[in-house]
Structures are given as C-alpha cells and as structure tokens.
C-alpha cells in the first residue's frame, strides 16, 4: 500500500473496531464510552475518523495519545482501554502473547512514512542534515517510539548516528518532536507524514530503504473488568 492506506479503509477499520468494542460493553440502550489508546503519529487522522464515527453513533470515544511504548506499558498495568492503535506491530503482538489482546482482532491499519522537517521556508532539510547546518535535531525516543527507532535507523544508514549525539533533542513521542520544530526549539526534526504541517516550512520525504517499514497494528484489548464498567 501507499504512504497511508486510504482514508476510507482507515475509517472502515476504526469504525469496525469501535462498533465491536461498543457491543462488547453490553449496554446498547445507553450511551457507551470507549477508551482508545492512539500512537501520537496517528492522532490527526484518528480525530477525523472519530468525528465521522460519532455523527452516527451514541458512543463517546475518548482518545489517549502517547508513544506506543508508554501506551503499551499503561495497558500492561491495567489501564482501561478497549482499543490500541500502535505505531508498530511488536507491542500489539506482545499484548496478544500475554493474553491481554484479541489475536483475531489484530489488523495492520497503516504503513507510516518518515519525514525530516524544518520550519524554514524554501530550505533543503536533507542538505542541512548531511552538512551539519543546524543547531538542534529533534527525534522521538528510539526506546519507546517506533518513529524514533526509524529516525535512529536513518541516521545510522547515513553514517551520522554518532556525529550528532550532542545536538539531539529527544521527545517522548512523535507529537513532541513536532512541537520542538514548530516552536523553533529544534532546527530539524523527524516527524510522521501523517502529521499536518500544511504549508509550514520544508520537508524531505525520507526514502523507505533507509529504515524498516513502519507497519502499524491495532488490537482490541481483552480487559473484561474495564469493559463492564
């Protein structure tokens, strides 16, 4: 599939998952509430999907946004989520292996792409990176954020991983990386192509061969205690 699987497909996936979770609450006559954990890179599309979904449903969808690693940890510790949209495949699989997520519900809902962004207009972010023409470089934490791991792989592929260690600004998730660049606290930053930058600044669409494909899976959480609340 292309950069992002088409919006209609994403909506169908999200709507199906939301409907399934709603029925699992066992209370079709009253307004249900579904807690959804969403990786930071997918928050813009997800908000649009939820807005469309709620036009035809009494279900209230509550989004919790963060890095996939932090959301996974919250779920593992009993956080009351019914759905988890991760930015990778490993964390949903780990929840399935531990019995905390439904194997049959797992689906790849998106394939992410990485960009290098600067708020400078008419700039060449790739040249800025390679030549070192910047002060600070923002990326998400590679230990908890799949897009941070991908950014780290890009630097490794370009032979720059060790060169700019003292210029890195680490965000806990891709949303924080975006804010570092937008606010001017970083000259360059690795962001997701799904994040809405409009016409602000300049970006380099990073070739996919420089990092592993960012396949993103969603799963239903098997937490009966929370689902009955």
Regions found by a protein language model. Name each.
Residues 4, 20-56, 62-65, 69, ...:
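Exported/periplasmic ABC-transporter solute-binding proteins
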Residues 10-22:
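Bacterial N-terminal signal peptides
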Residues 1-11:
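Bacterial N-terminal signal peptides that target proteins for export
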Residues 104:
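Active-site acidic carboxylates
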């Amino acid at each position: 599939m292309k950069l992002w699987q088409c919006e209609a497909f994403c909506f169908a996936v999200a709507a199906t998952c939301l409907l399934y979770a709603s029925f699992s609450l066992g209370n079709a006559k009253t307004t249900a509430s579904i807690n959804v954990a969403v990786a930071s890179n997918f928050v813009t599309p997800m908000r649009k999907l939820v807005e469309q979904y709620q036009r035809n449903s009494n279900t209230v969808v509550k989004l919790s946004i963060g890095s996939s690693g932090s959301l996974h940890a919250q779920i593992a510790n009993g956080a009351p989520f019914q759905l988890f949209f991760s930015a990778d495949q490993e964390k949903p699989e780990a929840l399935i292996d531990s019995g905390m997520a439904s194997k049959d519900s797992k689906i790849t809902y998106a394939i992410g792409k990485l960009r290098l962004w600067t708020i400078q207009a008419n700039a060449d972010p790739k040249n800025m990176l390679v030549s070192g023409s910047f002060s600070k470089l923002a990326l998400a934490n590679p230990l908890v954020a799949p897009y941070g791991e991908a950014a780290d792989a890009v630097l490794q592929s370009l032979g720059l991983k060790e060169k700019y260690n003292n210029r890195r600004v680490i965000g806990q998730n891709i949303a924080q990386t975006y804010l570092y660049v937008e606010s001017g606290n970083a000259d360059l930053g690795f962001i997701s192509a799904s994040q809405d930058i409009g016409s602000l600044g300049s970006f380099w669409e990073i070739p996919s061969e420089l990092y592993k494909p960012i396949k993103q899976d969603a799963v239903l959480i098997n937490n009966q205690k929370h689902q009955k609340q």
